[in-house]
Amino acid sequence: MIELDLPLDPGDLFHLCLSVGDVEVAKARLGATRAWVWAPVEDWTLDVFLPGGDVAPMEASVTYSVHGPLHVELTQFRAGPLPAGDDLVEPHHLGYWSADVEATTRSLIARGWSLEYQVGAVGGQPIAAMVRSPAGYRAELVPTTSRPRVEAWLARG
């Protein structure tokens, strides 16, 4: 049996991602039961760096619920190493702020986690990293330097 290992600070948790087949359909489905307010949908094309050195393009449409403190992220993966979602049932990952994505990733790997991919790099730091726990859940590490951009995006909702 794999022990539950929660080395990330719950205070750094800021979103729950649902992988969806269509962002607009998912927004409508969620809006039918609650008064959700969404940030504008952004279309992203990013280079994803896989373990072993391979690079793959990833295309996604992304939005966040505006109201927190825990935001819901809807992501439609259109191309890349991640499968497209088709429902709102299973979370794709939990998103955490990280002061040092690279160091946090190394620390988690030392605890038995695995790196699924990293996204880009700014000044030597990854823009984000997706890691998987020994128990099987994913966590996305997002640098705290991205927080002002994300908060400005949410304010446009």
Predicted regions and their residues:
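Vicinal oxygen chelate
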Residues: 1-9, 73, 85, 110-157
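A short, acidic/glycine-rich surface segment
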Residues: 2, 46-51, 80-83, 150
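Core segments of cupin and vicinal oxygen chelate
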Residues: 8-10, 19-68, 103-125, 155-157
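Short coil/turn motifs at helix boundaries and re-entrant loops, enriched in small/polar
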Residues: 14-23, 87-102, 136-140
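Helix-adjacent hinge/juxtasegments
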Residues: 61-88
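A generic structured-segment signal
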Residues: 71-76, 92, 102-105
